[in-house]
């Protein structure tokens, strides 16, 4: 692991070597906007903004991307809910349960699945207000997601409206699926078969499929 310093909380960002090419720009961009971001109480707390940068990228095949953290109790790990109360991760788990037949589980975490990096496009929000920090994170968000897409085969974005123009923001050619948000009305996410489709796309790219059942916590 490496680390760099920034002028505001969290003051130190610890990161895996695979993120090295974007770190100097990240530091520059963060120092420009941090004082604005940190006027608010945030979800997650600043010490957890960059926690996913500890993840390697060279072993990832799929990025599962949400728009921003939970407005309360964000952990810095996208979709993670230690007490398994958040609707998004419960819907994701339910979808994987139908796909895999696993039913006796107590939780689900995308971050423990081989080959998968869960990501949030914006790395924080004002406590209680989704997308409230979008304007501050925009340059950083684009920089980091572009870097991720240089490593993965499939980018799966959750939210048809939020990600309607995501392809225009990416420089690397990456297979992109824009699906329904897990909290979408009329149970649209339930009918969405993106997790299956991802594995078909990986096989077409001669990559190993994802074992989605690995995310279950018992």
Swiss-Prot record:
Catalytic activity, as annotated: Hydrolyzes single-stranded DNA or mismatched double-stranded DNA and polynucleotides, releasing free uracil
Q: Which GO terms describe its biological process?
A: DNA repair
Coiled-coil spans are: none
Which residues constitute the catalytic centre?
Answer: 68
What InterPro entries does the database record attribute to this sequence? Answer: Ura-DNA_Glyclase_AS, Uracil-DNA_glycosylase-like_sf
Which UniProt keywords are listed?
A: DNA damage, DNA repair, DNA-binding, Hydrolase
Highest taxon, organism lineage: Viruses
PROSITE patterns xrefs: U_DNA_GLYCOSYLASE
Q: What's a single GO MF annotation on this record?
A: uracil DNA N-glycosylase activity
Q: Does the keyword DNA repair apply?
A: yes
Result, substituting residue 179 to R: Defective DNA replication, reduced ability to interact with A20
The reply to whether DNA repair figures as a keyword in the UniProt entry is yes
Q: How does it assemble?
A: Homodimer. Interacts with protein OPG148. Component of the Uracil-DNA glycosylase(UDG)-OPG148-polymerase complex; OPG148 and UDG form a heterodimeric processivity factor that associates with OPG71 to form the processive polymerase holoenzyme.
What is the documented function of this protein?
Plays an essential role in viral replication as a component of the DNA polymerase processivity factor. Excises uracil residues from the DNA which can arise as a result of misincorporation of dUMP residues by DNA polymerase or due to deamination of cytosine.
This chain belongs to the protein called Uracil-DNA glycosylase
Natural source organism? Vaccinia virus (strain Ankara) (VACV)
Record gene name:
OPG116
